[in-house]
């Protein structure tokens, strides 16, 4: 896909990985990094594009508040970090988008939400309505209740949908 095709797209899905949101140590959100990413999204919206952000980072954002310095290996601690970090992540996005008078929303999905037709259709309707209202949906895998998703990186699959 050419740069011209990307800049003229009416709808853009941006996948943001944890390493793009955290400081050098990778264990805390970096507000300036989030602000820079949001500035790019805001520029896309300003030219008329609908933008969906698929963002990782909940586990990374939850590490420092829990006193953890590295990503935990066990599922329960990963889920605890995701639970703490998701609120921090969305709060940072909300604050960053507010600088541009843009409303952001949180959409947490699980595998069930994309494989069960009725769940998928409901999520799809919600996303379409958010875009219609001018909101930037911030989609993340619901890592606090997910199991295999944490290990297999389902945000990549979410972005592809």
Where are these regions (language model features)?
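Nucleotide/pyrophosphate-binding catalytic subdomain
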Residues: 1-161
